[in-house]
């Protein structure tokens, strides 16, 4: 029996305001989870992550299993002690990383055999192995092991992939329970961009029973309108009393559109990765700091922003200088800004849902970018 509790506190249209409660803390939803692939959110300290508003982070089962390995993490009592993060952690199952290996993997009914990207050794990973690894990591949310359906995929390929993932979902459930793990276990809805396959996947997962439901395979190159169509299809079918997690999707616009379609949880490397490439997110769009127009710009990244970089007065000209000189401080300050922006965006959406003003919030979000608000189902542009 999982110790996760989910309370749905308010709705506004399809947007949902809720709270996840774990023994290690609470998470207000909708929530964005910074990604700590190797047990670290690149460039910042755990206490800085907490200070900028994040309440839960994501760890990568696949990479942590390969390096440093379970013995080292086990010596620390799990990933929380290893990474010095005392809040909730979600660990992915490794399925997406195996998917990304493409030609270096072989998929069978039992699982996936692949060449390790670290040393080339042959490694096997299946549902049972993934559940054992995540038990050692001692994460608060465990993800089932699944096959991430590629895009594009024919309906037949998507169907066979979805059916394999359903069989693996049952094995994940059985292995998780057999280990006596009381962490939350989330199922993952697959089926590509085929509504009937998505429905069948969700029906099968609900028959097994999970603490939450993730929507996978929608950050693999599909057009935005097809992703949104799948979210719209799933919204009335997903159980209202369970949290919903859209995996790997992360432009600011994607977060707003996901929340508008009933999503509670998001993760993406975009705010941290883009910061390392000199792309800083703001309410009016993206500041690409390598652009020559910022060479003598005395403004902060976003005037009035409360992040450490902006509130301390670091100018765009200074950040551009640091970036051009490959100084470590540039990605550190950029990461602090981008994650602050993402977490504030989520906080603003939570407040708008609670006050019944999400429609107005969404309209003002696009207006600040000089963009037209895209219509939701039933609306006209």
UniProtKB/Swiss-Prot annotation:
The active site is at 92 (proton acceptor), 267 (nucleophile). Substrate binds at residues 92-96, 146, 190, 217. GO terms for biological process: queuosine biosynthetic process; tRNA wobble guanine modification; tRNA-guanine transglycosylation. It catalyses: 7-aminomethyl-7-carbaguanine + guanosine(34) in tRNA = 7-aminomethyl-7-carbaguanosine(34) in tRNA + guanine. GO terms for cellular component: cytosol. The keyword Metal-binding applies. Its EC number is 2.4.2.29. Zn(2+) binds at residues 305, 307, 310, 337. Pathway: tRNA modification; tRNA-queuosine biosynthesis. Residues 248-254, 272-276 are annotated as: RNA binding. Keywords: Glycosyltransferase, Metal-binding, Queuosine biosynthesis, Transferase, tRNA processing, Zinc. GO terms for molecular function: metal ion binding; tRNA-guanosine(34) queuine transglycosylase activity. Its cofactor is Zn(2+). Binds 1 zinc ion per subunit. Catalyzes the base-exchange of a guanine (G) residue with the queuine precursor 7-aminomethyl-7-deazaguanine (PreQ1) at position 34 (anticodon wobble position) in tRNAs with GU(N) anticodons (tRNA-Asp, -Asn, -His and -Tyr). Catalysis occurs through a double-displacement mechanism. The nucleophile active site attacks the C1' of nucleotide 34 to detach the guanine base from the RNA, forming a covalent enzyme-RNA intermediate. The proton acceptor active site deprotonates the incoming PreQ1, allowing a nucleophilic attack on the C1' of the ribose to form the product. Homodimer. Within each dimer, one monomer is responsible for RNA recognition and catalysis, while the other monomer binds to the replacement base PreQ1. Belongs to the queuine tRNA-ribosyltransferase family. This is Queuine tRNA-ribosyltransferase. The lineage of its organism: Bacteria, Pseudomonadati, Pseudomonadota, Gammaproteobacteria, Lysobacterales. The gene is tgt.
């Amino acid at each position: 029996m999982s110790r996760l509790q989910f309370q749905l506190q308010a709705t506004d249209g399809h947007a949902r305001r809720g709270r996840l409660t774990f023994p290690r803390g609470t998470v207000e939803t909708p929530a964005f989870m910074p990604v700590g692939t190797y047990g670290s959110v690149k460039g910042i300290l755990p206490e800085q992550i907490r200070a900028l508003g994040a309440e839960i982070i994501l760890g990568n089962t696949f990479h942590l299993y390969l390096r440093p390995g379970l013995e080292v993490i086990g010596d620390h009592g799990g990933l929380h002690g290893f990474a010095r993060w005392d809040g909730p952690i979600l660990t992915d199952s490794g399925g997406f990383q195996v998917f990304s290996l493409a030609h270096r993997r072989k998929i069978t009914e039992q699982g996936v055999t692949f060449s390790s990207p670290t040393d080339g050794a042959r490694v096997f990973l299946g549902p049972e192995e993934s559940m054992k690894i995540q038990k050692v990591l001692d994460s608060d949310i465990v993800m089932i092991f699944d096959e991430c359906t590629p895009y594009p995929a024919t309906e037949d390929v998507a169907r066979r992939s979805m059916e394999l993932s359903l069989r693996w979902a049952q094995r994940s459930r059985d292995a998780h329970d057999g280990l006596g793990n009381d962490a939350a276990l989330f199922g993952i809805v697959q089926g590509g961009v085929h509504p009937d396959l998505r429905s069948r996947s969700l029906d099968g997962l609900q028959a097994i029973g999970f603490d939450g439901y993730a929507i996978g395979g929608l950050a693999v190159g599909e057009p935005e309108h097809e992703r949104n169509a799948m979210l719209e299809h799933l919204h009335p079918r997903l159980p209202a009393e369970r949290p919903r997690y859209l995996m790997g999707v992360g432009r600011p616009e994607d977060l707003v559109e996901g929340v508008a379609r009933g999503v509670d949880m998001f993760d993406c490397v975009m705010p941290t990765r883009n910061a390392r490439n000199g792309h800083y997110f703001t309410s009016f769009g993206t500041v690409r700091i390598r652009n020559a127009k910022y060479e003598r710009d005395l403004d902060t990244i976003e005037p009035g922003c409360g992040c450490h970089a902006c509130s301390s007065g670091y100018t765009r000209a200074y950040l551009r200088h640091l970036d051009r000189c490959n100084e470590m401080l540039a990605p550190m300050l950029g990461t602090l800004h981008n994650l602050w922006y993402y977490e504030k965006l989520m906080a603003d959406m939570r407040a708008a849902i609670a006050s019944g003003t999400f429609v107005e919030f969404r309209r003002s979000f696009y207006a600040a970018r000089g963009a037209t608000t895209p219509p939701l189902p039933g609306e006209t542009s």
